[in-house]
Amino acid sequence: TGTFGHGARPDLANNPMDCFTTLYQQLSAFRTRSVDPFQCLTFSLGFVKSGEKYNVIPDKLTFGGTARFFSYEKAGRPFVEFLKKALEQNTALYGCKAKILQMPEALFEVNNHPQCAALGRTALEHDLGPQHIQDPQPWMASESYALYLQKFPGVLTFTGIANKEEGCGANHHTPEFDIDERGLIYGTAMAISYALAFLNNPQPIKFTPNPEPVEQLAKRNV
């Protein structure tokens, strides 16, 4: 929040856009300046809203976005701490005020349990054939299944739904997104195959659950 003013006299106003642009540049540069180059961190904005008239300096600005990472401790937590610090210091420097409207605790990354992943691969190669199994690149989208893996061992897999002839396979959150529903058959088969292998596995799964209360973990879900 800044101070309203006329475009002819910016010196008599306090434009929150000035504060925001500095903050945005700092957040964008945080990855290269402060995070291990072997750690992944992305930052993007989904919206910035401020003002309605070309000749009126607004008094408010709101913005929202996400930061994605594969290590909460090495990338996620440092980014959140820097965001809060930079927001406080920049608003003080520019004579503005700021309030965080919504920022839940960071969601954990999905890490498949090694034993479960090996068990699932063996089962799927046997039931579906090794030619149908791929190792995809790490995925940057947030996934609430990460919370389940904090309490129980498990594995997350993806089912192919692309079909160019049917026009299926566009990116998520786009108007063109659609799935080839025949892929759901293989997803069901994968789940059954893994469940049977897990239940018939004679080797105990070594796992230490996160001691954080379930109610607290649930608050991380965006």
List where the protein language model places each region.
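Acidic, glycine-enriched loop/beta-strand segments at the rims
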Residues: 56, 135-139, 203-205
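Active-site-adjacent substrate-binding region
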Residues: 25-32, 107-161
